[in-house]
Amino acid sequence: MFQPREPDKFEAALHRFDEENSRDPNHENNQPRELLYARRLTGWVLRLCPDAAEELRLAARCQHICRWQIPRSSYPMTRPGYLKWRADLKKFHAQKAGDILREIGYDETVIRRVQDLNLKKNFPDDPETRVLEDALCLVFLQFQLADLAAKTAEDKTINALQKSWQKMTDDARAEALKLDYGPREKILLQRALNG
């Protein structure tokens, strides 16, 4: 059974991450979107790795912390603009997480590890980064695919599915195949896997 090294710090960190994400002005299911996302991601991490280390649990909870503060629309609507936005977001999330963990009193070793996970350093060689990436892909498939498919050209959706699938471990792929997809999403996933 998981026991944080210092339970008060761990609970304070989760509370602060949730507090920050509860400020998201965007909502889904009547909840701040990034708060909901953080909880979904944490759920998948713990499902894939019930004995996840404290650093992985922290990283899951803050992976997209305050994401709305750097909107996609603030970058050129091009592929290079998208990639720059994603790279800047990763750094922003890692910095924000580090600041919060430092305020709470975590040592720099823990902070660096959480930030390395946020930045997905050493992927795919680092097993914890693999778990986090698997969880990110599963959150996408379970909760975001339908929305993407509804507003994106079919070939781009299939491309996104193929990229996600390539990053996933066999265990995560098995979990993905158990998800309850809508009819259109099932067809798109099948085309992605057959293509």
Regions found by a protein language model. Name each.
Residues 2-5, 12, 19, 26-35, ...:
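Divalent metal-dependent phosphate-bond-processing catalytic cores, especially two-metal-ion Mg2+/Mn2+ enzymes
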Residues 37, 52-61, 93, 110-114:
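Residue-level detector of well-ordered alpha-helical segments, enriched
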Residues 12, 16, 88-92, 96, ...:
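A non-catalytic, amphipathic alpha-helix used as a structural packing/dimerization or gating element
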Residues 54-72, 97, 116-122, 136:
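His-Asp-centered metal-binding catalytic motifs of divalent-metal-dependent phosphohydrolases/nucleases
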Residues 73-116:
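Helix-adjacent hinge/juxtasegments
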Residues 59, 74, 79-87, 185-195:
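Long, low-complexity, intrinsically disordered polar/charged segments
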